[in-house]
Amino acid sequence: RLVEFFRGRSRLPFIERRLAGRTLKMLIDTDAAKNYIRPVKELKNVMPVASPFSVSSIHGSTEIKHKCLMKVFKHISPFFLLDSLNAFDAIIGLDLLTQAGVKLNLAEDSLEYQGIAEKLHYFSCPSVNFTDVNDIVVPDSVKKEFKDTIIRRKKAFSTTNEALPFNTAVTATIRTVDNEPVYSRAYPTLMGVSDFVNNEVKQLLKDGIIRPSRSPYNSPTWVVDKKGTDAFGNPNKRLVIDFRKLNEKTIPDRYPMPSIPMILANLGKAKFFTTLDLKSGYHQIYLAEHDREKTSFSVNGGKYEFCRLPFGLRNASSIFQRALDDVLREQIGKICYVYVDDVIIFSENESDHVRHIDTVLKCLIDANMRVSQEKTRFFKESVEYLGFIVSKDGTKSDPEKVKAIQEYPEPDCVYKVRSFLGLASYYRVFIKDFAAIARPITDILKGENGSVSKHMSKKIPVEFNETQRNAFQRLRNILASEDVILKYPDFKKPFDLTTDASASGIGAVLSQEGRPITMISRTLKQPEQNYATNERELLAIVWALGKLQNFLYGSREINIFTDHQPLTFAVADRNTNAKIKRWKSYIDQHNAKVFYKPGKENFVADALSRQNLNALQNEPQSDAATIHSELSLTYTVETTDKPLNCFRNQIILEAARFPLKRNLVLFRSKSRHLISFTDKSWLLKTLKEVVNPDVVNAIHCDLPTLASFQHDLIAHFPATQFRHCKNVVLDITDKNEQIEIVTAEHNRAHRAAQENIKQVLRDYYFPKMGSLAKEVVANCRVCTQAKYDRHPKKQELGETPIPSYTGEMVHIDIFSTDRKLFLTCIDKFSKYAIVQPVVSRTIVDITAPLLQIINLFPNIKTVYCDNEPAFNSETVTSMLKNSFGIDIVNAPPLHSSSNGQVERFHSTLAEIARCLKLDKKTNDTVELILRATIEYNKTVHSVTRERPIEVVHPGAHERCLEIKARLVKAQQDSIGRNNPSRQNRVFEVGERVFVKNNKRLGNKLTPLCTEQKVQADLGTSVLIKGRVVHKDNLK
């Protein structure tokens, strides 16, 4: 037995006290939770301990049965009698030091309490053991090696002298749907726990886990009891933060949690186990600075926020699991497993186990993480892990946990029914046909649609009938019976899968060599309860193979046992049932053999004996059906790629030994007829009963079957439309499942609604799929930001001012082509264009051309331009406004149509220039643009019906009224032509919108939009982050 941890320091502090004339040396040990004293005759008031416990030291394990009360530091505290103490007479633990308010000052070798200072004495030694309540059993062969490992890795264990560190490689964040603060009123603190709360807050502040807060967020707190007792026998307590409102706004972190069954199943050949529990696990993860305010809580008049990851957050377990997975990634599955803050180390022999412990502890030290000493269990041949007892023999239920089920009172409300089923379901792997047994109790939770309702009020009273009471008692009795030990799987050996199906449920037992590995079961859904017996039996096999895929994938041999002999025909090649054919194909993928085992039930106690089993043989295929060519079939009944489920009248045909007809109504408007026929005459007679001449009738069967009676079908139903469907897909009736399927398909590649519908129809069907797909696409934030808007929303065109004479309103811009720049101007009245070459876009280079334009049009009142920096410079705006009295109107950024007059001219100008270049009149860019401008001004404009150069001529003033009338008419025609497809939008202050990004910035993978908040609605534009954005640039 090894029962010591080494401090690794040479001087240990102690104090001396007198007891009835005897001097006691009392060790100050902040790592010990309780106080201990050696039994001496001077002790008085010795009394028995209410709950005896074991203490281990270097001298062996000792059971603590007695205690006494002693006054130390002016504080009365219990001391437990321990006769294995040698170097010291007593040990003073942390409980007494904390309660008495003792402050240690090791630098000055003193301590202080209640204003009294006392000198410390020191005991010099190379190393001293301390008492621990864990009984550590270590084989003699590795005792020294294990001791050296613990000394070398002692930093992995938390001590009260050290503030709890944190992992520097991980930063936790709290992503919420918005930044609106969550505030909840504080709960009143009970007076009886006020001191505990204050001490807890002080300790958290001291350790740097929390800090004072001024956050607008607030979550309330309360105190709950937790396992164990303190030195006085009182229940331990825990301070809990109620983060429920914050959790409602938190975006889920979809990090996959480990599968508990798979962890337990993979502990196969291990003989030794060690379990580690990380000290205040979540508090060892650093919380991002910008999210700390969200964790604010108030207690006893103070307000604080967490600097580390707190307990109770929605994503806390996912964040911590990811962190531990990163720390132990190279070891997980090989020497250890991790489930949140519970680590189990497993090995096949003693020396490997010491080495594995050393490896894991080193990884934790490297990650700056600490393990709780009190909860560590070393070198166990049987240990509790995740609510199960694991050992070299297998897995069994934890008696302590099962005891809670055995003593559970009969539920009297929905809440207690849910609680009992949840508790019992945790151990369903130990109960064969759990779903069938629990079915009467589960039915209590079903709503009107036959499905278990999550929204049923938990306060609804419940009174068990006799059937439900029997099911309740049976579950308790099974768990109270002798433990069933689940065997670890050996993946080199064959697996035996025993399945069974009843009218209400299906179940399976996976085993090897007669010993169960796991047991699974579930109740049948409403449509599945209508399956034929052979379909239910086959469903049990298919479901079990899928559910146990982690065990069976890649297995060399799988033997399937069933008690239903007619399954022989169900798995035969000649069976034409499409569903059964799909299931058989799935079974064939698993290299499985199906065997028939006589008997009404397959119990685990039967040891799944394989003696006297008859392998199922396929029956010889009949040649009765006449096979016609697919070509002839095409001329009679058209084959469609649509699944059968899409049609209002659905007929599924299959040849069988016995005639059978079943009618189903799906989605209130669709009829499905399942017909098993033996001969053609009976089939035609039955078809007359189910065929609907008013709609298209869909038929699903294989081509040879349809070919055998297609001519009779046409002859008997000459005016009826038929379609042959190749596929039948799964009907989805649950609305939430429909949304989940469409959303999952859309999120796969974010394609359009029609593509999503086609993809979903390959496997599923439900009505109104199109509208749901369009809704999902329309509400997809990713699509909004990443996709081009093929049908952008545009504001209605409004009436803009119409000039009355030439030069009253002009539009200017800078046109660039072939690395040449031109200042362009177009008169809104005459459409006359002016183009001036410029060297650059700077103020210096555009000022002179602007003055030339003003010289040509001396009566300019308004200049329209875009957001070119030079146009908006102080120099240019001051010159136009102050010197010439000209108003400047700027178009909203990234909305060229607001300056459409000149933008449209640029298109025409480039078009004329390209034509001139092809005519080889010149290759000089400047000359081409200037010549194109001349030709433009000489061409009749489509709106004014005049040549611009003639309208500018002084002699054209008499035609001004006529030209203005044409401008007004053109504007009205444009409004009438465009506005029917446009709609004005109004935005509220604070409304979130998507703003189109500048295409010239970023690359092809840059998001096309960013989400922003509206500050003000300006009519045709909105104000966002202090800048004007035209509504056409919003999605």
Curated annotation (Swiss-Prot):
Q: Does the keyword Nucleotidyltransferase apply?
A: yes
| Gene Ontology biological process terms in this record | DNA integration
The catalytic activity, as recorded, is: DNA(n) + a 2'-deoxyribonucleoside 5'-triphosphate = DNA(n+1) + diphosphate
Q: Name one GO cellular component term.
A: DNA polymerase complex
**EC category name:** transferase
**Does the keyword field hold Membrane?**
no
| InterPro entries hit by this protein | DNA/RNA_pol_sf, Integrase_cat-core, Integrase_H2C2, Peptidase_aspartic_dom_sf, Retrovirus_Pol_polyprotein, Rev_trsase/Diguanyl_cyclase, RNaseH-like_sf, RNaseH_sf
Record keywords, A-Z: Endonuclease, Hydrolase, Nuclease, Nucleotidyltransferase, RNA-directed DNA polymerase, Transferase, Transposable element
Annotated transmembrane regions: none
What Enzyme Commission number does this protein have? 2.7.7.49
Indicate the segments forming the Integrase catalytic domain, all copies: 797-956
User: Which Gene Ontology molecular function entries are recorded, alphabetically?
Assistant: endonuclease activity; nucleic acid binding; RNA-directed DNA polymerase activity
The source's superkingdom equals Eukaryota
Domain Reverse transcriptase span(s) in chain numbering: 205-390
Q: What is this protein called?
A: Retrovirus-related Pol polyprotein from transposon gypsy
Q: Which gene encodes it?
A: pol
